[in-house]
């Protein structure tokens, strides 16, 4: 099994239900297994999604760095994917994960606990 997400192809039955944006990406919402707390939002392309399905490791595409990002590979804050679903329109992916360490790139538990508006 390769550690390069670009070498993974998404099953056609899944890919044909997926609605990617003009950049070839789909938003991915990540929830904590057991609590359903929203941990983060990231972007995936078909290779990141295929790699995630094959390895059960949260894998995303960084728009700012223009590269794949396997969550925890450098930080140790690994995501073990326990569930993955498409929404009714196929334009959003929902991942359920067992999170080790912080989910946010800042090291925080969630990306949504620092700037609460209501």
Curated annotation (Swiss-Prot):
Q: Where located?
A: Cytoplasm
> Which EC class does it fall in?
hydrolase
Task: Kindly list the positions annotated as binding Zn(2+).
Answer: 88, 104, 111
Keyword flag NAD: no
Annotated residues that bind Mg(2+) are located at 87, 89, 91
Q: Which organism is it from?
A: Corynebacterium glutamicum (strain ATCC 13032 / DSM 20300 / JCM 1318 / BCRC 11384 / CCUG 27702 / LMG 3730 / NBRC 12168 / NCIMB 10025 / NRRL B-2784 / 534)
Catalytic activity, reaction form = 1-(5-phospho-beta-D-ribosyl)-5'-AMP + H2O = 1-(5-phospho-beta-D-ribosyl)-5-[(5-phospho-beta-D-ribosylamino)methylideneamino]imidazole-4-carboxamide
Summary of subunit composition and partner proteins: Homodimer.
The GO terms describing molecular function are: magnesium ion binding; phosphoribosyl-AMP cyclohydrolase activity; zinc ion binding
Identification of the protein by name: Phosphoribosyl-AMP cyclohydrolase
GO cellular component terms attached to this protein's record: cytoplasm
Q: What does the record give as its pathway? A: Amino-acid biosynthesis; L-histidine biosynthesis; L-histidine from 5-phospho-alpha-D-ribose 1-diphosphate: step 3/9
Name the cofactor(s). Mg(2+); Zn(2+)
Q: How is the cofactor bound?
A: Binds 1 Mg(2+) ion per subunit. Binds 1 zinc ion per subunit.
UniProt record similarity statement: Belongs to the PRA-CH family.
Q: Describe the task this protein carries out.
A: Catalyzes the hydrolysis of the adenine ring of phosphoribosyl-AMP.
Gene, per the UniProt record: hisI
The UniProt record lists the EC number as: 3.5.4.19
> Does the record bear Hydrolase in its keywords?
yes
Q: Which UniProt keywords apply?
A: Amino-acid biosynthesis, Cytoplasm, Histidine biosynthesis, Hydrolase, Magnesium, Metal-binding, Zinc
Pfam entry (one): PRA-CH
What is a biological process (GO) this protein takes part in?
A: L-histidine biosynthetic process
């Amino acid at each position: 099994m390769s550690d390069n997400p670009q070498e993974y192809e998404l099953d056609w039955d899944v890919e044909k239900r997926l609605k990617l944006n003009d950049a070839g990406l789909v938003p991915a919402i990540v929830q904590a297994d057991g609590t359903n707390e929203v941990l983060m939002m990231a972007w995936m392309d078909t290779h990141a999604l295929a790699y995630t399905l094959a390895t059960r490791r949260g894998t995303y595409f960084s728009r700012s760095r223009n590269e794949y990002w396997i969550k925890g590979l450098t930080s140790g804050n690994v995501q073990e994917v326990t569930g993955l679903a498409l929404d009714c329109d196929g334009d959003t992916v929902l991942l359920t994960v067992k999170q080790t360490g912080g989910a946010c790139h800042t090291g925080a538990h969630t990306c949504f606990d620092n700037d609460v508006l209501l």
